[in-house]
Amino acid sequence: MGNCRSKQESHPICPNTQTPEPTEAEFRRAAVNSLYGRYNCKCCWFADRNLINCSDHYLCLRCLNVMLRTSNLCNICWKPLPTRISVPTEPTAPSE
């Protein structure tokens, strides 16, 4: 029963190991107001500050780090996660 081995073809684990192009997202310190209120992290639903735009939703930095540890795809939209973050210069005082 378990003594004979079946012929198995040797398949490489990752035949096409290509590094995906880094995707860039914009960092938001405060969430943008929308018609239905403030945006939140779509993963934990608690964070409304320090959000990263991921295709059609926002993720907080904590959830983004957790997702990047396991995979390079988003668990919500199944698109590549942003790996580069661009921080726009935000004014600290109103312009005169």
Swiss-Prot record:
Pfam families: zf-P11 (PF03854). GO terms for cellular component: host cell perinuclear region of cytoplasm; host cell plasma membrane; membrane; virion component. A motif (PTAP/PSAP motif) lies at residues 91-94. GO terms for molecular function: RNA binding; zinc ion binding. One of its GO terms (biological process) is viral budding via host ESCRT complex. It is a lipid-anchor. Its main location: virion. It is found in: Virion; Host cytoplasm, Host perinuclear region; Host cell membrane. A lipid is attached at G2 (N-myristoyl glycine). Plays a crucial role in virion assembly and budding. Expressed late in the virus life cycle, it acts as an inhibitor of viral transcription and RNA synthesis by interacting with the viral polymerase L. Presumably recruits the NP encapsidated genome to cellular membranes at budding sites via direct interaction with NP. Plays critical roles in the final steps of viral release by interacting with host TSG101, a member of the vacuolar protein-sorting pathway and using other cellular host proteins involved in vesicle formation pathway. Late-budding domains (L domains) are short sequence motifs essential for viral particle budding. They recruit proteins of the host ESCRT machinery (Endosomal Sorting Complex Required for Transport) or ESCRT-associated proteins. This is RING finger protein Z. It comes from Cupixi mammarenavirus (isolate Rat/Brasil/BeAn 119303/1970) (CPXV).
